[in-house]
Amino acid sequence: MPLDTKQQKWLPLGLNPQACVQDKATEYFRPGIPFPELGKVYAAEHQFRYLQPPFQALLSRYDQQSCGKQVSCLNGRSSNGAAPEGALKSSRKRFIVFDQSGEQTRLLQCGFPLRFPSSMDAERGNILGALHPEKGFSKDHAIQEKILQHEDHENGEEDSEMHEDTEEINALLYSDDDDNDDWESDDEVMSTGHSPFTVEQQACNITTEELDETESTVDGPLLKRQKLLDHSYRDSSPSLVGTTKVKGLSDENLPESNISSKQETGSGLSDEQSRKDKIHTALRILESVVPGAKGKEALLLLDEAIDYLKLLKQSLNSSKGLNNHW
């Protein structure tokens, strides 16, 4: 079968395009020269034009140096008269390509060996994936999937660790809140249930009973005896006794702090009363010493007592001077 005009550019100079025919028995193109190996190269280039685009992408990256070596080997055979046996064996190797694109299946024959360099691995994987999607995954894809799964596993572990950390933090916070609630409840119990309110109430009841007994036995504005909590006896006026009685009766319904404050005020009143008693006794002594001072007020009594003491001092000094003179 003669070649068309588009295929003439693949033929070297000095060859007749009409002499390149197809041998049906051997299934490859043979030019009208005594070198069938060179005809295989031209037949492969002719078949390349009838391949589908995926196969064209494969065959377009065929190593041209191998083709050149075959041509140089053929040229050496023409000059020397014999070719190496290895070159003939390599040139006789053929590859069959199945084209299953569309609904048709075609059998194509390639006249030269296909070699896939390391740079074509990615493209080969893409073409195989397009032809057979279920088998088109290479080892690199498997490794990448393993890496992605490992990263997802690590991310899942990190997420689980973060979740566990947050749960522990929440548990600690809730435990702190529970502890605070327990402390508050303990404080409330200590302020209400554990307070010695009953003892103080019993003491107040004892004082009120003693005051009632003293009032029933004594009538009028007389001094009365009051027995305190420390079992000490002090004199007190009837008005003070009345106030203490009212306070003692009202202390039963008062809290612990009020009872302690009332006790402190009671002790302060007793101290103040003792001071007043001492002042009254001193004023009575001055009234008895200073002539004409009975029935006077305390300030006037003090002034007269001072003047009287000065007069006594002067008289004493004058008497000493007279004694020294004699």
Swiss-Prot record:
Q: Where is this region: Disordered?
A: 175-194, 234-275
Question: GO MF annotations for this entry?
Answer: DNA binding; DNA-binding transcription factor activity; protein dimerization activity
Keywords carried by this UniProt record: DNA-binding, Nucleus, Transcription, Transcription regulation
According to its UniProt entry, one GO biological process term is: regulation of DNA-templated transcription
Q: Which CDD domains does the protein's record reference?
A: bHLH_AtSAC51_like
Q: Name one Pfam family in it.
A: bHLH_SAC51
Q: Would you tell me the Gene Ontology cellular component terms?
A: nucleus
Q: Which SUPFAM superfamilies match?
A: HLH, helix-loop-helix DNA-binding domain
Residue ranges annotated as compositionally biased, kind Polar residues, are 255-271
Biased composition regions of type Acidic residues, renumbered to the chain: 175-189
List the InterPro entries.
bHLH_dom, HLH_DNA-bd_sf, SAC51-like
Quote the subcellular location field of this record.
Nucleus
- The chain positions of domain bHLH read 263-312
Output the PANTHER family linked to this UniProt entry: TRANSCRIPTION FACTOR BHLH143, TRANSCRIPTION FACTOR BHLH145
Q: How does it assemble?
A: Homodimer.
What this protein is called in its record is Transcription factor bHLH143
Organism placement in taxonomy: Eukaryota, Viridiplantae, Streptophyta, Embryophyta, Tracheophyta
